[in-house]
Amino acid sequence: MTGHHGWGYGQDDGPSHWHKLYPIAQGDRQSPINIISSQAVYSPSLQPLELSYEACMSLSITNNGHSVQVDFNDSDDRTVVTGGPLEGPYRLKQFHFHWGKKHDVGSEHTVDGKSFPSELHLVHWNAKKYSTFGEAASAPDGLAVVGVFLETGDEHPSMNRLTDALYMVRFKGTKAQFSCFNPKCLLPASRHYWTYPGSLTTPPLSESVTWIVLREPICISERQMGKFRSLLFTSEDDERIHMVNNFRPPQPLKGRVVKASFRA
């Protein structure tokens, strides 16, 4: 077992087993998906996406046994996403990553069948309508997750502060202070996106997410990517299992429409 709660990414507890504990895994709006770019519907009514992130709202960095996660102060609307397909602001709660063992897999969403080495998820919640993140996470319009693909190539200078902190959270269950990191530095120049109704990609797999997947990837170096792959699924006392391939494969679209903010 690579995780707590009886789920992980191993042979015996990986995505193909999740439906036993979480039947919604076979639901009608599951994520991720394969985005077929030619079938995405250009929607001129979609608003431009605005990510208004204040500089000093990050709190901590954690290895939760499934990913590495940076948590934020979400007590007010200082760090929000607005526009796009959303009505009103959604507050940033945390961001985390999914990645592969090698560069040919790692992302959760795929585009025309192509995987990227990694995918960043910025998780936001609808604080106008719901009083807690937990309440929002089980409501159909409760969450908005911005997905950013990572490819490898040139070094990403802003990513160094994050990758240089990973040694502090190598083991599952470890946490370190991580203040004043603005995730705006991890966004690509273009705000073009695809959007569709979906779910969390980890248990409980709640169908509460408006997905906003940015078209343009960001680039990090193989050295930086290697620091993610040196994290462990396991605690300090356990046999070491490297944290790699922590992604769920694409799920059936089941009639959902993927909208695009741009003309193909």
UniProtKB/Swiss-Prot annotation:
One Pfam match, given by its short name, reads: Carb_anhydrase
- Subcellular location field: Cytoplasm
Which SUPFAM superfamilies does this one have? Carbonic anhydrase (SSF51069)
User: Which Gene Ontology terms cover its molecular function?
Assistant: carbonate dehydratase activity; zinc ion binding
| Cofactor(s) of this protein | Zn(2+)
Which E.C. number(s) belong to this protein? Answer: 4.2.1.1
GO terms (BP aspect) = neuron cellular homeostasis; positive regulation of cellular pH reduction; positive regulation of synaptic transmission, GABAergic; regulation of chloride transport; regulation of intracellular pH
Task: Provide the alphabetized UniProt keywords.
Answer: Cytoplasm, Lyase, Metal-binding, Zinc
Q: Which reaction does it catalyse?
A: hydrogencarbonate + H(+) = CO2 + H2O
- What is the documented function of this protein? Reversible hydration of carbon dioxide.
Give the family, as the similarity comment puts it: Belongs to the alpha-carbonic anhydrase family.
Mind telling me what this protein is named?
Carbonic anhydrase 7
Species per Swiss-Prot/TrEMBL record: Homo sapiens
Please spell out the taxonomic lineage of the organism that makes this protein: Eukaryota, Metazoa, Chordata, Craniata, Vertebrata
